[in-house]
Design a protein with these regions (language model features):
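Generic structural signal for well-ordered, non-membrane alpha-helical segments
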Residues: 31-35, 55-59, 124-128, 162, ...
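A short alpha/beta connector and helix-capping loop motif
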Residues: 159-179, 192-200
Length: 241
């Protein structure tokens, strides 16, 4: 892929990130500009190399938020492996991103041999919770100290391996980020899907969501930018798959 110097110079925030710790040096008000740069890089690279564009455009803000909040030693597992392009860009692979999906280049999925920040080699879907459970149990046995975060969609949550992980998770300190974007290859069916649909329209849930937005919005200086950023995350995850 050829990219002119002028285009590269526009990615001033992205170029400054060598690992996730550099992301924390940015002010929260600068994150939307970083997200714009990430989208430009995604579109330009996938246009040249092929790959999964929509699913990655849809999790730009979500990925930035996770790496901004969690520590560099924490483990983030993407249940849909081909949704990890933004994660790669924020974990020291920006300079090599033009090699994505090429021979001897970056993998289109998380690869534990490619980066210390790829905690597990996920493929398509439903493995993250069980994999995260294994990492969390090993951490506790070794008395280590890091968080385990699994990003799982509503479609992947219908997979049997997800249920296996949930069945064994009791008492384990780990976090599941539920990417409820109403997206899957086939139509979601079953009681889990029905119950999730009910939650989305419950008055209690809607009241809580509205109250949380108002409370956060009242925080001096940073309240409104945080609300705006969270809304952009919500819009983005609805487009992801």
């Amino acid at each position: 892929r050829q990219m002119c110097i002028r285009d590269r110079q526009k990615l001033m925030f992205l170029e400054s990130i060598g690992d996730p710790s550099d992301l924390k040096k940015l002010d929260i008000k600068q994150l939307p500009a970083l997200c714009d740069e990430l989208r430009k890089e995604l579109i330009q690279t996938v246009e040249q190399n092929g790959g999964h564009l929509a699913s990655n455009l849809g999790v730009v803000e979500l990925t930035v938020a996770l790496h901004y909040v969690f520590d560099i030693r924490d483990k983030i597992i993407w249940d849909v492996g081909h949704q990890s392009y933004v994660h790669k860009l924020l974990t020291g692979r920006f300079k090599d991103f033009s090699t994505l999906r090429k021979k001897d280049g970056l993998s289109g999925f998380p690869d534990i041999t490619e980066s210390q920040y790829d905690a597990f080699g996920t493929g398509h879907a439903s493995t993250a919770i069980s994999a995260g459970l294994g990492l969390a149990k090993a951490r506790d046995i070794k008395h280590d100290d890091f968080s385990v975060v699994c990003v799982v969609g509503d479609g992947a949550l219908t997979g049997g391996l997800s249920y296996e992980g949930l069945n064994s998770i009791d008492g384990t300190n780990m976090l599941i980020v539920f990417n409820d974007n109403d997206m899957s290859i086939g139509k979601n069916v079953g009681s889990a899907t029905k119950n999730l649909s009910r939650v989305r329209v419950r008055k209690g849930y809607l009241k809580f969501k509205s109250g949380l937005e108002k409370t956060v919005g009242k925080i001096p200086l940073i309240g409104k930018p945080i609300v705006k950023f969270l809304k952009s995350i919500k819009r983005a995850v609805k487009l992801s798959c």
